[in-house]
Amino acid sequence: MRLSPRKDKYYMNNEVVRVLVTSPLGVGGVTNMMIHIQEHLDKSKINFDYLVFHDRHEPMEDKVLSLGSKKYVASADNVKFRPFRRIWRINEIRKVCKRNHIKILHYNADCAADMTNIIGAKLGGVQYITIHSHNAGFGAAGNGIRFISKILKPLIPLFCNNFYGCSELAARFLFPRSIIESGRCSVLPNGIDLEKYDYNEAVRREIRKKLNLEGKYVVGHAGRFSDQKNHSFLLDIFQAVHRKNPNTVLLLFGVGELQEAMKNKARTLGIEDAVIFYGASNEMNKMWQAMDVFVMPSLHEGLPVTGVEAQASGLPCVFSDAITKEVGLTSNTEFLSLQEKPDVWAEHVLKYMNVQRKSERKILEQAGYDIQQTADTFAQLYLNVAEKL
């Protein structure tokens, strides 16, 4: 879809270019990435606003407001019949975009069913839409989502102008073959602030003392408590780890609908005293330092930002083989089958007990994961787009 080369009042008189970003404002990988990008933008020229789909206060809301963002809500929470919520939200998004004269949208997508939201934005007058794939599978999604995605996937090139995938796998999952084969899609690494996440022994001692982890072998994980992240299997793995070495702790960051169920399972497995359900943290760069190994047995991922953050902090990482191997950036990463028993996983988790942590900053810089590179890509794209609208 070509943009007509005209000027719009919205971008005249040296106004700041506003890009509307879809992202929940909880503590999650994509949200953290967008905020890190925003922190590295020249906000006298370009800034982000956020579109959320639930009318509630969220952990990172105050942070984005302090960066000069506006928060827009397009909620269907009051619609009791779930199948109607997606239809209702189309109109809510249309109204938000029309009322606020939104011209540019950066849509962080999980699957092609998200096209209903993009259609709402288009109906609201949005002229330029980037769709950014962050997922590589449906996981536990119902047949309804799969069916809607199959129907709407061919419409993506009709409504969107720019196509990003956080990995090649994520791009192939979301976009039609025509987009992939024509070369219109780009892989954009999930950049992070490498200096902020770099291994720091002093911070490690500080956080381990604060959390009473001194002398412990800390198995860490960060992710929303949802089916996709596979916390149930993670607890099984840790039970095996703890049985082999009682001087171990499982440190979990995140919130979500399955959190209470996982607390109950930890009690059932008899490991509740060795599992810390920390909840959300806006200081994950420090929290990574306290861990000794990162374990991620997800059922599917695009390219997990948390996996990049963990490696940037010098952590060994054990991923499931359902995660793209593109995330394996450092030498201390491995991928295990979800069909393997927890005891096998436990052996791999424990083998890193004597690994000496070190900075991995140069390796991640060379791989393109410096947040400033990502921010520069965003700025160049949207400043050029704004000139043509």
Predicted regions and their residues:
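A conserved mid-protein helix/loop that constitutes part of the nucleotide-sugar donor-binding site
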Residues: G28-H36, Y217, H221-R243, E257-K263
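Acidic anion/phosphate-binding donor-loop and adjacent secondary structure
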Residues: R82-F84, R172-I179, G183-R184, P189-K210, ...
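Aromatic "clamp/platform" in nucleotide-sugar-dependent glycosyltransferases that forms part
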Residues: D110, A280, L299
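Short hydrophobic beta-strand element within catalytic cores of glycosyltransferases
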Residues: P316-S320, K325
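A charged, aromatic-enriched C-terminal amphipathic alpha-helix characteristic of glycosyltransferases
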Residues: Q356-L389
